[in-house]
């Protein structure tokens, strides 16, 4: 295997270095694109109203499933006067006392009950305290929503939620379980003793601007958002305000980190490539079917992958290879649960994560109840209408993958037609993620997978691996938050590699996998899903070292 790996890497090394290291890195600059779109928008004579889904409409998109709350009451029984017109609002969230993530979840629940329909979520940020520095780090985020509450009534509801969550009067800028601030309210500019909109310190706070930018798309999506840009203290709008503070260059520093909540911890997927080791419990998987069906063999395999550098173990009990037959929920659970329980109890799994690969909501629910940290859905919810609801209620992160059709139809001719595979995959996957968000899965809990080998030809797979930044850029046009989601690539041992290299046996494709994974990481992948953990973990370490070196040189 070593000579084969060396030969493959020598042949691919020159291309990869030329493609990824000589020019500046192919990293998304959504903010720069946003500024161009912003100026184009204002130079237009007619401002079209576009929904968060990018569809022209006469009013803001307001999904009934999320917006059925009684607008006549707040989080308590107090009667609130409402307006007849819905207004789009932006609300910032902060917390540094108690279980910060639970504080956010409860705040969102109370906001919905109080008459605020949340339609978009930012990414999640852990930030250093300012002004009063001798206190715990904050968790910060922001949401967009619509409400019929007037601005002062909205403020009253938010203050009630803060009190209900245990906030008391104390040191200004001091510790608090929950902080809710109105950043924008429709097209209004408000200045009163109790309320100033836009928020008076908005433009100087990176921990507010970072999540605010996430709520936008690099293409201005409606005239209310255009008005918010016009309120900025800089002519380039919100995006230029963010850039003037440092923009994306700030993220990852001690002062502000973009994180994803998994279990009781916050994970930063930007500081290293995370390796996901594959554990197939199926008799018919294309690469290692039937090898790990017993508990002992599965546990032994996990122990080996952990020792070789796996950060995540992805357990699947339903084959998703082309033409795979769908098994019953009970059969999938019978395969999965005993192994999941055994793996969860392994001492080696401390500080490691378990992902369960299923497109069945019943299996997903049981897996999460039995210790799964991540739900990995190859259909992004298209094969089970209950999946998004189950994941939303569970609180676990959701890996949404692009696929057309199902495993039996995904390689049909009609599912292989693309105008531009990266743009089309980004657009279709965004719509699935958007549906998940409107079902209650915040953007800060989403990871994305462009679906290498699923509804793709050889050339499609190569285009995706080489142009991951293009996928992020396309998503950023509609949601900068989604464009920041961790990206997984999973080319491991797949048929297109065999077609390229003349390797009909899946187990002979590990060297080709290393080459494709290397290209993916240098193109911006955060997670690699592989069979051979040892070789790919080494490749990831080398790629990470090259990327760190490049960043250090500016």
Curated annotation (Swiss-Prot):
Gene3D superfamilies: 7,8-Dihydro-6-hydroxymethylpterin-pyrophosphokinase HPPK, Dihydropteroate synthase-like. It comes from the Eukaryota. It is found in: Mitochondrion. Coiled coil: none annotated. Ubiquitous. It catalyses: 6-hydroxymethyl-7,8-dihydropterin + ATP = (7,8-dihydropterin-6-yl)methyl diphosphate + AMP + H(+); (7,8-dihydropterin-6-yl)methyl diphosphate + 4-aminobenzoate = 7,8-dihydropteroate + diphosphate. Pathway: Cofactor biosynthesis; tetrahydrofolate biosynthesis; 2-amino-4-hydroxy-6-hydroxymethyl-7,8-dihydropteridine diphosphate from 7,8-dihydroneopterin triphosphate: step 4/4; Cofactor biosynthesis; tetrahydrofolate biosynthesis; 7,8-dihydrofolate from 2-amino-4-hydroxy-6-hydroxymethyl-7,8-dihydropteridine diphosphate and 4-aminobenzoate: step 1/2. Residues 275-554 are annotated as: DHPS. Mg(2+) binds at residue 280. Its EC number is 2.7.6.3, 2.5.1.15. Keywords: ATP-binding, Folate biosynthesis, Kinase, Magnesium, Metal-binding, Mitochondrion, Multifunctional enzyme, Nucleotide-binding, Transferase, Transit peptide. The keyword Glycoprotein does not apply. InterPro entries: DHP_synth-like (IPR045031), DHP_synth_dom (IPR006390), Dihydropteroate_synth-like_sf (IPR011005), Hppk (IPR000550), Hppk_sf (IPR035907), Pterin-binding_dom (IPR000489). It is an enzyme of class 2 (transferase). One of its GO terms (cellular component) is mitochondrion. Its main location: mitochondrion. Residues 273-541 form the Pterin-binding domain. Residues 1-42 form a transit peptide. PROSITE patterns: DHPS_1, DHPS_2, HPPK, PTERIN_BINDING. The keyword Transferase applies. GO terms for molecular function: 2-amino-4-hydroxy-6-hydroxymethyldihydropteridine diphosphokinase activity; ATP binding; dihydropteroate synthase activity; kinase activity; metal ion binding. (7,8-dihydropterin-6-yl)methyl diphosphate binds at residues 320, 357, 376, 449, 494, 529-531. Residues 90-215 are annotated as: HPPK. In the N-terminal section; belongs to the HPPK family. Catalyzes the first two consecutive steps of tetrahydrofolate biosynthesis. This is Folate synthesis bifunctional protein, mitochondrial.
């Amino acid at each position: 295997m070593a000579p084969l790996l060396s030969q493959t890497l020598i042949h691919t090394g020159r291309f990869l270095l030329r493609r990824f290291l000589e020019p500046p890195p192919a990293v998304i600059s959504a903010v720069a694109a946003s500024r161009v779109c912003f100026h184009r928008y204002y130079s237009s004579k007619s401002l079209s109203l576009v929904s968060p889904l990018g569809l022209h409409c006469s009013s803001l998109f307001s999904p009934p499933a999320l917006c059925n709350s009684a607008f006549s009451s707040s989080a308590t029984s107090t009667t609130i006067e409402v307006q007849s017109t819905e207004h789009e609002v932006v609300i910032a969230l902060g917390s540094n006392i108690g279980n910060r993530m639970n504080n956010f979840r409860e705040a969102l629940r109370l906001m919905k009950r109080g008459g605020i329909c949340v339609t978009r979520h930012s990414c999640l940020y852990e930030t250093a305290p300012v002004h009063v520095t001798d206190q715990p780090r904050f968790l910060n985020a922001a949401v967009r929503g619509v409400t019929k509450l007037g601005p002062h009534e909205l403020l009253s509801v938010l203050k009630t939620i803060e009190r209900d969550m245990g906030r008391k009067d104390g040191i200004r800028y001091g510790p608090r379980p929950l902080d809710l601030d109105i950043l924008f309210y429709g097209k209004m500019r408000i200045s009163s003793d109790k309320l100033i909109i836009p928020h008076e310190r908005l433009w100087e706070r990176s921990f507010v601007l970072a999540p605010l930018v996430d709520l936008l798309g690099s293409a201005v999506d409606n005239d209310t958002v255009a008005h918010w840009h016009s309120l900025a203290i800089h002519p380039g709008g919100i995006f230029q305000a963010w850039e003037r503070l440092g923009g994306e260059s700030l993220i990852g520093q001690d002062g502000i980190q973009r994180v994803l909540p998994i279990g009781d911890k916050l994970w930063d997927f930007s500081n290293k490539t995370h390796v996901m080791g594959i554990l197939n419990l199926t008799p018919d998987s294309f690469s290692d079917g039937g090898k790990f069906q017993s508990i002992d063999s599965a546990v032994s395999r996990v122990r080996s992958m952990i020792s070789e550098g796996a950060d995540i173990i992805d357990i699947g009990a339903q084959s998703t290879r082309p033409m795979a037959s769908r098994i019953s929920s009970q059969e999938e659970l019978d395969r999965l649960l005993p192994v999941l329980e055994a793996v969860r109890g392994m001492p080696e799994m401390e500080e490691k994560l378990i992902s369960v690969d299923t497109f069945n909501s019943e299996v997903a629910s049981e897996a999460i109840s039995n210790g799964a940290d991540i739900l990995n859905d190859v259909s992004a919810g298209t094969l089970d209408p209950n999946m998004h609801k189950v994941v939303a209620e569970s609180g676990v992160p959701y890996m949404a993958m692009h696929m057309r059709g199902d495993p039996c139809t995904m390689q049909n001719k009609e599912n292989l037609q693309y105008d531009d595979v990266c743009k089309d995959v980004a657009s279709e996957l965004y719509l699935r993620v958007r549906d998940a968000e409107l079902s209650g899965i915040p953007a800060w809990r989403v990871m994305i997978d462009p679906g290498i080998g699923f509804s793709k030809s050889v050339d499609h797979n190569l285009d995706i691996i080489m142009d991951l930044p293009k996928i992020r850029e396309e998503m950023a046009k509609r949601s900068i938050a989604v464009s920041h989601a961790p990206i997984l690539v999973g080319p491991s041992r797949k048929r297109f590699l065999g077609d390229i290299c003349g390797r009909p046996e899946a187990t002979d494709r590990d060297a080709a996998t290393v080459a494709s994974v290397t290209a993916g990481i240098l193109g911006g992948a955060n997670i690699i899903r592989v069979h051979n953990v040892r070789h790919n973990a080494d490749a990831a370490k080398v790629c990470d070292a090259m990327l760190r070196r490049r960043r250090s040189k500016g």
